[in-house]
Amino acid sequence: MVMVGNIKNNLFGWFRHSPPDALFDRQLVWIALCLMLTGLVMVTSASFPISSRLTDQPFHFMFRHATFLCLALGTSAVVLQIPLQKWQSHSHYLLGIAFALLVVVLIAGKSVNGASRWIPLGLFNLQPAEVAKLALFIFMSGYLVRKQDEVRATFFGGFMKPIMVFGALALLLLGQPDLGTVVVMLVTLFGMLFIAGAKLSQFLALMVAGITAVVGLILIEPYRVRRVTSFLDPWEDPFGSGYQLTQSLMAFGRGEWFGQGLGNSIQKLEYLPEAHTDFVFAVMAEELGFIGVVLILALIFSLVIKAVFIGKKAFEHQLQFGGYLAFGIGIWFAFQTLVNVGAAAGMVPTKGLTLPLISYGGSSLIIMSIAVSILLRIDHECRLISMGNKTDLQTDEKE
């Protein structure tokens, strides 16, 4: 027991405290790269059958995902050079761009399966909803820094204004329709307001209102009602509304403890729809088994915990904007992972959300890579402040 305790403490210490002389969090970089590599491998495996059928090229989606990955890494390298102050001062412009893109996609967007969520850009289809998530969280972080006292003191002045901004975004998103993104944004927004010190009574009242609104949005659309009913009992109509979920559950069952082996999934052979996108986790469960998916989930939630630690460090160094944004990114990644995994496992209705840094999709991969890059930038600026304080202290001691 003592040995286990020592290993646990050493592992936690290594995870929480990266080398003090480094200018960035190396552990966060390795975690993100491991998730991206896992995504490339699993997209290659899961997309093999559909690539062969649609393009006669079994590695078509692998090449596209690899291209997205290179774009994501290149974009992240550029974003890493941008100071936090620039993000804060230009947050309203980013939000304006997100609004414009959401309007464009409703007018000239590409429709897939009845949903108009993509703007064709040649190399890939841009999904404005992904841009809107990050833009809202950056804007909210700046707002909470400017209006922190109002958020804590008044209901309309500080609390309802950001909800109104979210409401405008939500209306455009529901026009696509994209309820899943709306729910992710709402939960993350609630979390950021709670961290900012919003009154618990107001927070709970708004949460009840939010849940009521989501339930109402489900009830007014027959296809959403079918999704919920099929999620509650997919075996009632296994070849109709419950088909995707029953195939996903069979993939989980076949995986058992150690999986069928990489590339050996049966469900991806035209049985499980969206095997390389929304339901890539089911293919992972079948091929890698319970042990494999637990390790991958541990990686994702390691990234989430890293975001929380970075946010805490930012608040300690008086980087309020960075603190709110780091916590927002952490909540976003955590909740979206829970929804994606829950949908694949039959615990929540399907929402069409990607598994962070793993699922196929250029917009999601690039935007989430940018979010990780911003986390690295927040940590970097905290380290620069610490190094500056340490240098000042050493100078004072010499004097």
UniProtKB/Swiss-Prot annotation:
Transmembrane region(s): 28-48, 65-85, 92-112, 119-139, 155-175, 178-198, 200-220, 290-310, 321-341, 355-375
Cytoplasmic side: 1-27, 86-91, 140-154, 199, 311-320, 376-399
GO BP annotation list: cell wall organization; FtsZ-dependent cytokinesis; peptidoglycan biosynthetic process; regulation of cell shape
Pathway it works in: Cell wall biogenesis; peptidoglycan biosynthesis
Molecular-function annotations in GO: lipid-linked peptidoglycan transporter activity; peptidoglycan glycosyltransferase activity
Entry GO terms, CC: cell division site; plasma membrane
E.C. numbers: 2.4.99.28
Catalytic activity: [GlcNAc-(1->4)-Mur2Ac(oyl-L-Ala-gamma-D-Glu-L-Lys-D-Ala-D-Ala)](n)-di-trans,octa-cis-undecaprenyl diphosphate + beta-D-GlcNAc-(1->4)-Mur2Ac(oyl-L-Ala-gamma-D-Glu-L-Lys-D-Ala-D-Ala)-di-trans,octa-cis-undecaprenyl diphosphate = [GlcNAc-(1->4)-Mur2Ac(oyl-L-Ala-gamma-D-Glu-L-Lys-D-Ala-D-Ala)](n+1)-di-trans,octa-cis-undecaprenyl diphosphate + di-trans,octa-cis-undecaprenyl diphosphate + H(+)
Cited Pfam families: FTSW_RODA_SPOVE
Predominant localisation class: membrane
Residue intervals on the Periplasmic side: 49-64, 113-118, 176-177, 221-289, 342-354
Topology with respect to the bilayer: Multi-pass membrane protein
Assigned keywords, A-Z: Cell cycle, Cell division, Cell inner membrane, Cell membrane, Cell shape, Cell wall biogenesis/degradation, Glycosyltransferase, Membrane, Peptidoglycan synthesis, Transferase, Transmembrane, Transmembrane helix
Family of the protein in this entry: Belongs to the SEDS family. FtsW subfamily.
Function: Peptidoglycan polymerase that is essential for cell division.
Designated name of the protein: Probable peptidoglycan glycosyltransferase FtsW
Lineage of origin: Bacteria, Pseudomonadati, Pseudomonadota, Gammaproteobacteria, Vibrionales
Gene name of the record: ftsW
